[in-house]
């Protein structure tokens, strides 16, 4: 495995020829950079943004494995770029990667997004003025925005832009990620909530940045609240997904009450692809986060149906339609998986700009409590073998049966026989919950993630795990959760 920052891409850079490009005002320079290439560029003149984050002039930016665009909002901008071979991540790339794609487009929906931002900013300003002269128990919250839409509609891009623009106005909105496929200041398989107090790091593999690490960072490190879902698709266990939405909603609303600046700034929520068939999930998001603005991207029918279904909240809930950008494209499953692997690698090793020093060691299996998230299909398979009429409900004839344990079994099950087949090459979440917790059932559903380890090897004979930590230290004796997210170094 190559160490980020020690590849030989710099040698190629001296021989590659640079290209100078002018991005006209209000144009987008749309780019698709494969994982086997690195796009290095500088903004020479003008103002250029990536997903709302303004780029510094005459400062080299590196992008790899991304599909995004550069936007010139005010005047014509001039950039200079060069494309070089990616020598750092040979484990992720292959000769079958698509080539570099770039083109200019004047079909931008940035004006609509800017209008939306100004609307939300007016709400924030009203909230600030009101809260300034109000007692604590009468204070209001800034706009809480839920962004929904169909697949490949640009929801994540809009959430980044709105968060970045809000931060430019000295706000600290809470960015909530309810798309477990993506790792937002965490690893894939998680749901997170993060106060955005600084600009995003556009050079990180997913365009967000790093959390608190053992090294120094250019941007302020983010400290998210992380809930472990353990799967990449919310359909793998919808009941568990809705339960985590409820738990994360409680944590976010509590965070708003603790910090007036965050409360004034509000919440911005990114979601997976949802349709009218997922109304129960949308309703869960609206009720648990006290949503007052729903942004529907590129799906007028969905907007109309939501307006009808939320008619009883018409005075409390605004449903806003937003045009889908013509730059939205379908993303292949292989590309998504490569991004997930890169996110995991960056969590442990850092990137070309921030090199981290992960710690590899062996730990004893004895004394560890390891749980595994439950897939709905596996739970239904178990129920199929029960006697007719039986289920997992409490048995009234058995007074010793623990109802909390029964509830836990729908979401987590203890790994009774940890071995190489169920732990090797997996990502394991370390919870805040100590091993000796007496209310394990209830507390495991309420707890958050402290960090992650990677189990690279399991010795079935010696019952020892070879694990990778993000930093050196004593392994905490906390409850562990083995996720469905696999990873090979």
Curated annotation (Swiss-Prot):
This is mRNA cleavage and polyadenylation factor CLP1. Required for endonucleolytic cleavage during polyadenylation-dependent pre-mRNA 3'-end formation. Disulfide bonds: none annotated. ATP binds at residues 28, 152-157. Belongs to the Clp1 family. Clp1 subfamily. The keyword 4Fe-4S does not apply. One of its GO terms (molecular function) is polynucleotide 5'-hydroxyl-kinase activity. It is found in: Nucleus. Gene3D superfamilies: Clp1, DNA binding domain, P-loop containing nucleotide triphosphate hydrolases, Pre-mRNA cleavage complex subunit Clp1, C-terminal domain. GO terms for biological process: mRNA 3'-end processing; response to xenobiotic stimulus; tRNA splicing, via endonucleolytic cleavage and ligation. It comes from the Eukaryota. Component of a pre-mRNA cleavage factor complex. Interacts directly with PCF11. Its main location: nucleus. GO terms for cellular component: mRNA cleavage factor complex; nucleus. It comes from Candida albicans (strain SC5314 / ATCC MYA-2876) (Yeast). InterPro entries: Clp1, Clp1/Grc3, Clp1_C, Clp1_C_sf, Clp1_N, Clp1_N_sf, CLP1_P, P-loop_NTPase. Keywords: ATP-binding, mRNA processing, Nucleotide-binding, Nucleus.
């Amino acid at each position: 495995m190559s160490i980020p920052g020690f590849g030989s891409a710099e040698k190629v850079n001296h021989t590659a020829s640079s290209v100078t490009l002018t991005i006209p005002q209000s144009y987008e320079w749309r780019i698709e950079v494969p994982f086997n290439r690195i796009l290095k560029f500088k903004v020479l003149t003008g103002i250029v943004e990536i997903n709302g984050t303004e780029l510094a002039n005459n400062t080299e930016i590196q992008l790899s494995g991304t599909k995004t665009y550069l936007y010139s909002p005010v005047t014509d901008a001039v950039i200079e770029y060069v494309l070089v071979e990616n020598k750092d991540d040979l484990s992720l790339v292959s000769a079958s990667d698509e080539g570099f794609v770039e083109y200019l487009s004047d079909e931008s929906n940035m004006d609509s997004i800017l209008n939306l931002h100004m609307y939300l900013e007016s709400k924030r300003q009203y909230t600030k003025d009101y809260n300034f002269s109000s007692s604590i128990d009468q204070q209001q919250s800034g706009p809480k925005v839920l962004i929904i839409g169909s697949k490949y509609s640009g929801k994540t891009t809009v959430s980044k832009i709105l968060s970045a623009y809000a931060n430019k106005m000295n706000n600290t909105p809470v960015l909530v990620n309810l798309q477990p496929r993506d790792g937002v200041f965490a690893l894939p398989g998680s749901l997170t909530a993060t106060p955005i107090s600084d600009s995003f790091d556009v050079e990180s593999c997913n365009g967000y940045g790093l959390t608190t690490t053992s090294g120094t960072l250019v941007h302020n490190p983010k400290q998210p609240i992380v809930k472990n879902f353990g799967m990449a698709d919310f359909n793998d266990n919808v009941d568990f997904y809705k339960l985590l939405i409820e738990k994360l909603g409680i944590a976010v609303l509590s965070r708003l009450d603790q910090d007036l600046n965050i409360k004034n700034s509000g919440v911005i929520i990114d979601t997976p692809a949802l349709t009218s068939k997922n109304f129960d999930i949308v309703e869960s998001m609206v009720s648990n986060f006290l949503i007052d603005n729903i942004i529907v991207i590129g799906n007028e029918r969905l907007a109309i149906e939501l307006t009808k279904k939320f008619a009883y909240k018409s005075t409390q809930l605004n449903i806003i339609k937003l045009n889908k950008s013509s730059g939205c494209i379908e993303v292949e499953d292989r590309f998504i998986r490569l991004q997930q692997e890169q996110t995991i690698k960056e969590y442990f090793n850092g990137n070309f700009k921030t090199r981290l020093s992960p710690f590899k060691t062996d730990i004893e299996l004895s004394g560890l409590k390891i749980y595994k998230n439950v897939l709905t299909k596996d739970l239904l398979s178990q129920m199929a073998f029960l006697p007719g009429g039986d289920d997992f409900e409490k048995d009234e004839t058995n007074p010793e049966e623990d109802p909390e344990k029964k509830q836990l079994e729908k979401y987590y099950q203890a790994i009774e026989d940890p071995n190489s087949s169920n732990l090797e090459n997996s990502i394991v979440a370390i919870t805040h919950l100590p091993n000796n917790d007496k209310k394990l059932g209830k507390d495991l559903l309420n707890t958050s993630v402290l960090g992650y380890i990677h189990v690279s090897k399991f010795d079935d004979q010696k019952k020892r795990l070879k694990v990778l930590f993000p930093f050196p230290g004593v392994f905490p004796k906390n409850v562990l959760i083995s996720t469905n997210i696999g990873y090979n170094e």
